[in-house]
Amino acid sequence: MLDAWLLIRRALALAALAEACRMAYAFRMHAIDDYGSVIHEFDPWFHFRATEYLVQNGWHAFFHWFDHASWYPLGRPVATTIYPAMHITAAAIHASLNACGLAWTLEDVCCFVPVWGG
């Protein structure tokens, strides 16, 4: 009998976890569902621009990029002032989707990366 209760508790815990994941995904998709793949805020615009720079100019240029358009008038050395994992991930996903024949724009990928990342 104890094993049955343990199985029920685990099933309920798994169901609660699955529902929490579904709700978190739906919450992150809300803006995309309502307004489409549009970048709304400043930080996502910077991250999109940084990812675009990585895709267009490659690794070496990205890690030596001094961005004069941010932190005006001083600018900023991008590679030493950000965590580049999101940009690298978005660039890799964009390249993978294009290699598979799926024509996703970089902006679309950058809109969905936070949803997929949680």
Positions of PLM-derived features:
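Start-transfer (signal-anchor) and selected internal transmembrane alpha helices
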Residues: 1-31, 42
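Active-site lumenal/periplasmic loops and adjacent helix-entry segments of GT-C-fold
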Residues: 27-118
